[in-house]
Amino acid sequence: MEKRILLPTDFSDNSWSAIVYALKLYKDEVCTFYFLNSIGIEAPTMTYTSNRLLKTMRENALKEMLELKDMAENSNINSNHKFDIIISSEDLNESIENAVNKYDIDLIIMGTLGATNIGEFFFGTNTVHLVNNVRACPVLILPEEFDFVEPKQIAFPTDFNHFYSEKEIEPLLKLADLYNAKIRVVHINIEESLDELQKYNLIVLKSYLHNYEHSFHWMPDYAKITTEINDFITDLDIDVLAMVNYKHSFIEKLIKEPVIKKIGIQPQVPFLVIPE
C-alpha cells in the first residue's frame, strides 16, 4: 500500500537532512513524498507591494523546490518513490493542515522549527506549537542534521491512565513494521503498582502489541520527565521515541516544564508524536 509522506522544507541543511532520513526510512516502500514550502506573509490586507513580494517569493520557492526535487530524485534508488511539490502562501500550520487533508498524508517528517542557537539542540517553540496544532496526522520530528539509524528499538512512555485506541497505536505499529522494531513500553511513576484502571489499560495495550516484539519497563519518578526519558533512551539504546499527544499526556507535561516553555524540547533521537 502506497504511503504518503509530507516533508516541510525551508531549504536549510536541517530540512534536507530530514528528507534524506525519510528516503532511507522508506527505502523499500512504495511512497509519494510531498515537499511543502510555506511563504505566508503576515499582513492584515494584501497590498500591491505585498502581492508583488508574494509573487517573487513564490517564483523563488518554485525554483528551489524544483532543484530540491531533482536532488532527491538523483540521490534516490527506489523507483517506487514519487515526488511532488507544494508551495503555499498560508502560514506553516495552515499549510500543513491543508496538505494533510488534501493529500491524505500518512506521516509528516521534519526537522525543527524555531530552534535556539545555544549550543545544545532543542525543539524550538515553533515546533512545540506545531505539535499541539496538528491533530490529523502523526509527526516524526528529527534532531538537527540527524544521521539515519534503522529504528530497531522504539520507546513508548505511558502512565497507563489513558485508554489507547487502535487508531492511536497504529502509527507506532506501522513504524515498528518497517524494521521489525522492538517496542519498549516504559511506565514512569512514583510507585510500580497500578490501580484497576491502569491495569485494564495495560491489558488493552498488550493486546495491540501481541504480534510485535515488546517489553514493559518501570522507572521511578525521580527527576524532570525530560531527564527520565533521556536516561531511558540512553540506557536501552533507543532509536525512536513515540508518544500519543492527549490531554495530560507526557507530551503535555514535557511542554509545561519551565525549561521547555522557554527553549523547547530537547531530544536525543527522532520523536514520533501521535495525535489523539
Kindly give the residue locations of the regions a language model identified.
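Charged docking surfaces used in two-component/phosphorelay signaling
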Residues: 84-95, 223-226
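A short helix-to-beta-strand connector/capping loop
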Residues: 76-84, 210-217
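A short, acidic, amphipathic alpha-helical segment used as a generic capping/interface helix at domain edges
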Residues: 222-234
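Small/aliphatic-rich secondary-structure junction motif
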Residues: 1-52, 153-219, 235-238, 266
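A short acidic, glycine-rich active-site loop
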Residues: 52-63
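Gly/Ser-rich helix-loop-strand patches that form or flank binding pockets
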Residues: 97-147, 234-236, 240-276
